C-alpha cells in the first residue's frame, strides 16, 4: 500500500502526464497494485455491450497492440497539447476553443526512463480576448532516470529530486494508479477498463479506441480516454483525456514527422540528472520508507 500511496502522490503532479502519454508502450502492471488499489467499482459502466464481432475485433487489436509495444525500446516525438475547460473561449458558432495550447518533446526508454518538456505555450486572456504567450521557462518539465524523478517547479524556482524506493526501480513508471497507460497488456486492459473500438466509418488510416474505468482508483483520474492509433503501425497519433465530473479535457497529438522509434536517443545524456538553473534551489526528497 505504501508503494501505491507514494506513486499516487508523485503521479498527481509530474508523472501523471507521462502516464497519459506512454499508454502506447508495453509495460506491465504489477499484480500487487491491482489487488490493493483497484477493488472498488467505479459504478455502472457506461460502455454498451459488444456484439461477438465487435468483441473479436477488440481482442485482435489489443493482442496486436501488445505485440507492437513489446518491440519498442526507445521513442521520442514532438507533441502538441490543447486544454479545454470552463474558462475556454468560444468561436462565433459557440464551439468551445482551447483555453491553452502548448508544444514540447517527449522521450521514453524501456522500461522506466522518461522525459516530458513543454517548450512553448500560450493561454487565453479573457480581458484582452487574445492568447498570451507564456514565458519559455514556465512549462512543465521533468525527467525520470529509473532511480529518481527530477521535476522543475518554475513558480517556486526549484529543481526537486524524488528518489524511488529500490523495490520500485526498473518498473516505477508502470506502478501507478493508471496501469492502463503503462500496461498495454490485453488481459490487464480488459480487467480494468470497458473498452470498444469507435473508429468513424469514414476514417480508414486510423483506429480509435475508447476506454472507461471500471474501478474508482482509475475513475478518480479520468472519466474516459479516447486513443487514436495509426492503422499502419499501431503507433500513437493522439489521445484525449476527459476529466472526472465535467467536460474538461486535455488533447495530445503526436507529430509523426518527428517520431523516432528505437533510434536517436542518448540514454545517458537524455535522462541524466538535470543541471540546477541559476537562481534555483535543488531539493532532494526521499521516498517514504527508503
What residue spans do the PLM features occupy?
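A mature extracytoplasmic/lumenal domain signature
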Residues: 79-83, 110-112, 120-122, 148, ...
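Non-transmembrane domains of secretory- and envelope-associated proteins
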Residues: 35-49, 155, 203, 215-224, ...
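A mid-sequence, solvent-exposed acidic-amphipathic segment
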Residues: 189-224
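N-terminal secretory signal peptides that target proteins for export/translocation
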Residues: 1-15
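N-terminal mature ectodomain segment of secretory-pathway/periplasmic proteins
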Residues: 56-151, 155
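Acidic/charged, solvent-exposed loop-and-adjacent secondary-structure segments enriched in E/D, K/R, S/T
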Residues: 150-180
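Bacterial N-terminal signal peptides
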Residues: 14-31
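Short, hydrophobic/aromatic-rich segments at coil-to-beta transitions
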Residues: 71-78, 111-117, 203-212, 233-240
Amino acid at each position: 500500500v505504501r508503494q501505491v500511496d507514494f506513486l499516487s502522490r508523485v503521479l498527481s503532479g509530474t508523472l501523471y502526464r507521462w502516464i497519459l502519454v506512454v499508454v502506447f508502450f508495453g509495460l506491465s502492471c504489477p499484480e500487487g497494485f491491482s489487488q490493493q488499489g483497484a477493488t472498488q467499482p467505479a459504478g455502472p459502466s457506461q460502455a454498451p455491450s459488444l456484439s461477438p464481432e465487435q468483441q473479436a475485433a477488440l481482442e485482435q487489436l489489443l493482442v496486436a497492440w501488445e505485440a507492437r509495444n513489446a518491440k519498442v525500446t526507445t521513442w521520442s516525438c514532438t507533441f502538441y497539447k490543447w486544454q479545454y475547460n470552463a474558462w475556454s473561449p468560444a468561436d462565433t458558432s459557440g464551439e468551445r476553443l482551447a483555453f491553452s495550447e502548448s508544444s514540447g518533446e517527449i522521450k521514453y526508454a524501456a522500461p522506466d526512463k522518461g522525459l516530458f518538456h513543454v517548450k512553448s505555450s500560450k493561454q487565453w486572456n479573457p480581458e484582452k480576448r487574445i492568447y498570451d504567450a507564456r514565458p519559455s521557462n514556465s512549462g512543465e518539465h521533468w525527467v525520470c532516470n529509473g532511480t529518481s524523478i527530477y521535476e522543475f517547479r518554475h513558480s517556486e524556482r526549484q529543481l526537486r529530486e524524488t528518489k524511488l524506493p529500490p523495490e520500485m526501480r526498473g518498473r516505477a513508471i508502470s506502478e501507478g494508479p493508471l496501469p492502463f497507460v503503462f500496461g498495454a497488456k490485453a488481459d490487464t486492459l480488459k480487467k480494468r477498463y470497458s473498452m470498444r473500438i469507435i473508429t468513424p466509418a469514414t476514417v480508414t488510416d486510423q483506429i480509435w479506441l475508447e476506454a472507461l474505468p471500471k474501478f474508482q482508483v482509475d475513475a478518480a483520474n479520468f472519466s474516459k480516454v479516447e486513443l487514436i492509433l495509426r492503422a499502419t503501425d499501431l503507433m500513437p497519433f493522439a489521445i484525449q483525456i476527459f476529466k472526472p465530473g465535467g467536460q474538461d479535457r486535455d488533447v495530445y497529438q503526436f507529430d509523426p514527422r518527428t517520431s523516432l522509434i528505437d533510434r536517436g536517443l542518448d540514454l545517458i545524456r537524455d535522462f541524466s540528472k538535470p543541471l540546477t538553473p541559476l537562481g534555483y534551489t535543488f531539493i532532494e526528497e526521499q521516498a517514504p520508507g527508503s
